[in-house]
């Protein structure tokens, strides 16, 4: 090979490497990076985009108003990698079971979980609404689809036991990415204070939900997912393939109730079906809500949703 062809080869390789790195960075910025954002102020309200949420606009705003008017206590913890993570505690009554609640992808606690406070109070539960890393009032700039958030969740569990006492009764609750987070947390060893897990419209794995969305956007996942995964490693400093809710269910021993709207076109209903089938715990239940889109199972069928949770607690033998 003469020098000309060698330079052409080296130039081509260099171009491909540079193009791959640029593509990986673009994927990271679009999919995982979370820039600082201004949250709604007094008299301002945010609801998720899309027609399915506009139908419930009045309810979503009313729930936000409700939790802004309720008394609450602010808490914060330090993550394993030095981020300050924040949450707000809404007490139903002293000694009530406490739900540790986690929101969805690119959401924040007030927007995604306000209705959950109403549901908690109907069940006689208190609620600790938590902003994920890189979301809401918490620090950070990288969303990790539950990979690092599960470690944060476990830290919140330890904090709650210290704060509320060894006799605290705790429930891990999440919606969408928050559901994936609590499910992955449940795959590890959890203390007896955790009584059960509620996973609303969670996905089976980061890879599966990301490739599903890529297909929806008419992007080739066989090409794009490896680039996105590279971006996560290089710029987000985590591995998208490290763990998944599906893997976690193989070792989960806590009771788990899965809830999912049948007409969810973002995280398919079938994902909760498969997660429930994979769950190895003695007590598990799938709450199916016809006609509910993504994250709307409770707004669509409030009484049925609450009653299903009451029945699940009875099936598990809980006296609260």
Predicted segment positions?
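Hydrolase active-site cap/lid region
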Residues: 184-241, 247
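An N-terminal hydrophobic leader/cap segment in hydrolases
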Residues: 13-78
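Alpha/beta-hydrolase active-site loop
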Residues: 143-164
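Short beta-strand/loop motif that positions the catalytic acidic residue
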Residues: 251-253, 258-260, 264
């Amino acid at each position: 090979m003469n020098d000309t062809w060698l330079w052409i080869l080296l130039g081509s390789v260099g171009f491909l490497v540079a193009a791959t790195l640029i593509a990986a960075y673009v994927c990271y910025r679009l999919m995982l990076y979370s820039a600082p954002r201004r949250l709604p102020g007094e008299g301002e309200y945010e609801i998720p985009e899309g027609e399915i949420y506009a139908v419930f606009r009045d309810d979503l705003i009313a729930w936000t108003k409700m939790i802004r008017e309720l008394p609450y206590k602010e808490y914060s913890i330090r993550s394993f990698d030095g981020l300050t993570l924040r949450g707000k505690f809404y007490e139903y009554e002293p000694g009530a079971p406490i739900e540790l609640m986690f929101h969805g992808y690119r959401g924040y606690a007030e927007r995604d979980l306000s209705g959950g406070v109403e549901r908690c109070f109907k069940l006689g539960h208190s609620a600790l609404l938590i902003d994920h890393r890189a979301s809401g009032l918490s620090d950070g700039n990288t969303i990790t689809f539950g990979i690092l958030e599960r470690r944060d969740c476990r830290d919140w569990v330890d904090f709650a036991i210290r704060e509320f006492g060894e006799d605290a009764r705790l429930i891990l609750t999440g919606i969408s990415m928050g559901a994936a987070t609590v499910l992955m947390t449940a795959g590890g060893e959890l203390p007896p204070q955790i009584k059960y897990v509620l996973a609303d419209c969670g996905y089976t794995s980061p890879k599966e939900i990301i490739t599903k969305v890529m297909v929806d956007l008419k992007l080739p996942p066989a090409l794009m997912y490896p680039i996105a995964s590279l971006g996560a490693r290089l710029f987000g400093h985590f591995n998208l393939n490290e763990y998944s809710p599906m893997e976690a269910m193989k070792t989960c021993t806590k009771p788990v109730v899965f809830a999912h709207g049948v007409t969810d076109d973002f995280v398919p209903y079938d994902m909760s079906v498969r997660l429930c089938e994979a769950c190895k715990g003695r007590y598990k239940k799938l709450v199916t809500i016809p006609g509910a889109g993504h994250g709307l199972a409770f707004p669509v069928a409030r009484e049925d949703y609450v009653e299903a949770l009451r029945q699940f607690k009875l099936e598990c033998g809980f006296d609260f």
